[in-house]
Amino acid sequence: MSFWKKSRYFAVFLTAACAMQFCAGCSVPFLEKQESDGSGYLFTASLPANPKSLDPQSATDAASKTIIENLYEGLVELDENGSPQLAAAESYTTSADGLVYTFLLKNDRYWFYDANQDDVVDDDETWKVTASDYAYAFQRIFDPQTQSPYTTMFSCLQNADAVQSGQLDPSEIGVRAVSDTELQFTLSRPDAEFLSNLASTAAMPCNENFFQQTKGRYGLDKESVASCGAFYLRLWFYDQYGNQNQIFMRRNAVNAKARSVYPTNLTFQIRKSSDEAAADFTDGTSDLMTSSVYQPQYMESDNYSVTATRSVTLGLIFNPDDTAFANAKIRKALSMGIDRANIGGNSSGDLLPAYGLIPPAIHWNGTSYRDTYPDAQTAYDPDAALTLFQQGMQELGRESLDSAKILVCASLMDCDNLHDVIQTWQEVFGFYIGIEEVSESDYWDRLQSKNYTVAVCGITASYDSPAGVLEQFSSRTNPFYYANGTTDAASRHCTSAVRKRNSSKMRPAGTIPSG
């Protein structure tokens, strides 16, 4: 969800709960018109962490993507309904078989690199964005040396597997610049999500000459970033021991008129946690706030502008090294032992039951995925759950579970209904599991070190697609060290099997969706 007071905005992620999953969401419309159009304004926001990289073909963290979206412009962008709209592209056509996409680029899009840092556009500091810049970006995605996390997203491209495995040169990927203003994509199979995926940060252009000049530093510091979007990077200062860290961006004059850019400057205070970022909004330091937790002081006030979407699913995750909770029957029994109908009753409407991993805010073919594929209901069946639980205990040769606690971070998620889940488990299975609340930094440290038994974790998409949710469970990238070859294979074939993957993800995996 997002909120503004007068010129201040607050974003909040609402949640939906299910087998142990909850949904939430947020948007950060810096250029959205409120009481005025924002012309000439300086907007300030706070990031909960320092961006890891401003390389669009590699960055995955939210802080990095926030900056990248203001630095670069792609061929298309998504509107408020998740439908792709033309951005840097003037037009496009699709072949009858859905395998060839041809884009014509606009002639008024430019790169800008303020080499002498005088905030003036000199002739030698700007050059046109061309089709080759987009082609090179996709070559980088599939170049094995890049190790880009976005190969699955664009696995439909011709020669994707062969290039990624090193059998073919990256230049053989199915993207070519026909001319400076004409770009052609060739797919090996139709992909209904391809056009929407072109709105992701991964599909932003990359100028090969500039990339080579950075000598391996591309996107890692201010001197290694060129802008082709609404703003350019003026300052990126970060000292892990300091508290004056910030990113300062100025309006990109060469693109401002064509893109109708309203603010003159954007300032991002770099904080160490979501709590610190929230405190900036409370004391008036920042104009915008995003949150995955219901904030009544903003939500229930007429003084703030609020935007909310259900884009996060909360789920229970289990330590893969824990013998008891690694047992599939015990995990399934716990899922069946959750009365999801009662989830969200006391949550002020921000928490709803969730029966699958993909939240309502995710789109598929321009509509909500859940409108097309509703959640498969997981029935509350305490008798069957107890029977399955006892079978699991017999397989383990145990009579009871060891004492354990569920790891939670209150600043990241709404866990009020967790007490109801625990009480139901005690009634059904005869054991009690506690709650351990930790700080945001400790929470992530504990997950990464696998120092937990059970934890509540928020699952959201890295991009607006069902595949963007399921890819969070990749054995290579997920934060809770869950590994499953079947899930990885399903994620690689997300376009043709997305509905099946959603079901298989929810049940055999070490995750129980709840709200």
Predicted features, each with a name:
Residues 249-299:
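Ligand-site clamp/hinge motif
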Residues 90-152, 184, 324-326:
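Aromatic- and charge-enriched surface segment that lines or borders ligand/interaction sites
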Residues 132-136, 180-186, 264-265, 312-360, ...:
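Alpha-helical secondary-structure segments
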Residues 376-378, 434-443, 468-515:
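Extracytoplasmic/peripheral linker and loop segments enriched in polar/acidic and small residues
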Residues 351-392, 413-415:
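Structural transition elements
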Residues 46-97, 104, 226:
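N-terminal lobe/hinge region of extracytoplasmic solute-binding protein
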Residues 242-244, 391-461:
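Ligand/substrate-recognition segments at binding pockets and active sites
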Residues 170-172, 176, 180-181, 186-265, ...:
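Gly/Pro-rich hinge or "lid" segments in bacterial periplasmic/extracellular proteins
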